Amino acid sequence: MQTSKIIYQENIKSKLMGNINYGGGMSSIFSSESVSEGHPDKLCDVISDSILDACLSLDPNARVAVETMVKGTEKKSFIFISGEITTSSEIEVDYEKIARIAAINVGYNDHDVGMDASSSELCEVTVKITKQSPDISQGVDLGKGLHEGHGAGDQGLMFGFACDETDSYLSLQEVLMPLPIALSQRLTLAMTEGIKSGLIQWGRPDSKSQVTIEYGSDGKPKRADTIVVAIQHLDMLDSFENEHEEHNFIESEITKKIVHNVIPHELIDENTRILVNGTGRFVKGGPYADAGLTG
């Protein structure tokens, strides 16, 4: 069973990495990305999830399919909520209030940051929610529809696997995820927690990361090839001579307080590249910089 498990994992990994032949002495690299809760797309996920949680708390049998879009402009930000929600009884859910609270909790309570969800003047919420289509619901309800015994509403394809390649690292044991995505997720989580705790006082909600891991010929993680971090920040030019000095400060802070506290030290060597805000400044962020969508 253990041998089959290893072969299965390596076959899956081989496909993801481009059919690398580990037995031929070749190494390979694999990259994974993660975004923080302040990223526009993830903000939409948070809002949709918050609405789902509210509906299920009132009706455990609720059927909820909610899509959210956010976008900011110079003068105003917008949250668009649409979808289909069906409950077993008439319940009242304040979708706008839920959306605003969710965005505020993420950190969007200042228009200069990307959105001020606390202000009805600076942030407009539009809600277009209907009940689930009867043509769809009859495919979900047992005893209804063309096949009365099915009770399935849709078709889909899913795949995935658990792996133990993180178990060699104390802080990542029993994660059961590939190392690149596990580290990427922990980088964005560390930045979010650092902002909320005050460790990174100049940080703003929108951030993302990407980790590239080099795998040896045996298919096991060997080293961190590249670590990329982007974090939205306060305009600090008043405190520095120029943008270059501002960037050096941000790079030093993130490398010291985030990267070296998240990435296991044995994965970092003299050839590991650490790139922080590689495009330069990242003051304008969130829904103002990019439209966000659920999913």
Regions found by a protein language model. Give the residues of each.
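Short glycine/threonine-rich loop-to-helix capping motif typified by GTGT followed
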Residues: 89-90, 281-295
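N-terminal low-complexity, intrinsically disordered segments
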Residues: 39-42, 94-98, 135-137
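Glycine-rich, mobile lid/loop segments that gate access to catalytic sites or pores
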Residues: 31-35, 70, 74-76, 104-287
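Short, charge-patterned binding micro-sites
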Residues: 66-88
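Intrinsic-disorder-associated, low-complexity terminal segments enriched in Asp/Asn/His/Tyr and depleted
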Residues: 8-11, 19-21
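N-terminal, positively charged regions that mediate nucleic acid binding
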Residues: 19-65
